[in-house]
Regions:
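Helix-boundary and loop/linker segments of multi-pass membrane transporters
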Residues: 1, 122, 167-169
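Non-catalytic, topology-defining segments of multipass membrane proteins
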Residues: 4-133, 195-245
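Membrane-embedded alpha-helical segments that form the functional core of polytopic membrane enzymes
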Residues: 8-22, 136-140, 169-180
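Transmembrane alpha-helical segments that form the membrane-embedded catalytic/substrate-channel core
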Residues: 20, 69-76, 132-159
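Histidine-centered catalytic micro-motifs
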Residues: 24-36, 146-153, 177-193
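Flexible, active-site-adjacent loop/turn segments at secondary-structure boundaries
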Residues: 42, 166, 188
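Short, motif-level signal for alpha-helix interfacial/capping segments enriched in acidic residues
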Residues: 128-131, 158-168, 172
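Active-site-flanking alpha-helical
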Residues: 158, 194-195
Length: 245
């Protein structure tokens, strides 16, 4: 029953966040195997968080609808290609052959729901259906303020997740909204642990982990200077103090 409910909410959550769930299952498995590997083109976090952005481009990533400028590089565009029968590099390299048909089917369902939202908006002469179904990622991208804490400013191509990943302490409301993913080092070390158990896991292994940032503000106190330095020197990274095991 729990597995069944997990699958239902995974499908719903994936649609809400523009992830085709089959593709995301396998590409995210790759990410957890090779965290921040610049040699792996399908490590999403590496592609998103390790391109040494300027402070200007970093700040623009929080501006509503700004991501539409790069629609051809978005997950939505990839889903449309999968729905139309195109084989993308991530489909070829990450998704098992027996899962490809499932990926295409779910991609087509996503596209049909997007089209239906536009049709309903047109019929009602009201933008709300499209804004709530197709556009949330674009007007709600302020949520990136959480996501950006995961790996930004940290080293690449290091197998020890404690160096490449950051944990932050959030207030209870932020923690609930973020599904406890602020315990991100713990999540990478033990990806099969459910998110609601990450605080307990963190407490059990805290003597083996680098010190977590105490808040969003504390995290960005180290992230923003690192962005400025990395834009000028791409060999720079934040060095975390990691306990020996």
């Amino acid at each position: 029953m729990i597995s069944y409910l997990n699958e239902i909410f995974y499908q719903i959550g994936s649609f809400m966040t523009d992830f085709e769930p089959t593709r995301w299952t396998w590409s995210h498995f790759r990410h957890h195997s090779n965290t921040s590997s610049v040699s792996d083109p399908h490590d999403f976090e590496a592609a998103l968080f390790h391109q040494y952005p300027s402070l200007k481009s970093f700040l623009f990533s929080f501006v509503p609808f700004y991501e539409l400028i790069y629609f051809k590089h978005s997950f939505k565009y990839e889903i449309i290609k999968h729905a139309l029968g195109f084989t993308t590099p991530v489909m070829r390299d990450c998704i098992p052959q027996n899962e490809i048909a499932k990926c295409r089917l779910i991609s087509r369902i996503h596209v049909l729901l997007w089209v239906a939202s536009f049709a309903l908006s047109f019929y009602l002469m009201n933008p709300l259906p499209a804004l709530l179904i197709f556009f949330p990622r674009y007007w709600g991208n302020i949520i990136n303020i959480f996501n950006m804490t995961q790996h930004l400013g940290l080293p690449e191509d290091v197998k020890d997740h404690r160096y490449t990943t950051r944990s932050v302490r959030f207030n209870p409301i932020f923690s609930f909204l973020y599904w406890h993913m602020e315990y991100h080092v713990e999540h990478h070390m033990f990806p099969s642990v459910p998110s609601y158990n990450l605080p307990k896991l963190s407490n059990l292994i805290k003597d083996q982990l680098p010190k977590a940032n105490t808040s969003l503000f504390d995290a960005y106190k180290e992230i923003i200077p690192a962005i400025i330095k990395q834009h000028k020197d791409n060999t720079y990274f934040i060095k975390k103090s990691v306990p020996s095991i």
